[in-house]
Amino acid sequence: MRVGFTCSAFDLFHAGHVMMLKEAKKQCDFLIVGLQTDPTIDRPEKNKPIQTVFERYTQLEACKYVDQIIPYATEKELLDILTSYPIDVRIIGEEYRSEEHTSELQSHSFISYA
């Protein structure tokens, strides 16, 4: 079974999120979604989420492409998820293609762009 992972804050869940999750699910048999609880913890310049974690979790839970949801608060917790779960492919948005990803993260899973 091929396990995929993608993550976001998923604030104000919309059709673009659903399409991204649909594309991510095409690349794996089991899709784990990391739910960032508050992007401002690691990056104060980001906006605080409008919806609560519960609201965002509930919306993700209702999406048929999502098999498991793992909330996380910090980049360190994200790294812990990526190193603790048997992830075969990490799916990230095309807009992140030019960003550097640490070799530690790359060594744990293949990165694919949705």
What residues fall within each predicted segment?
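Hydrophobic alpha-helical segments, chiefly the membrane-spanning helices
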Residues: S112-A114
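Nucleotidyltransferase catalytic core that binds NTPs
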Residues: M1-S103, S107
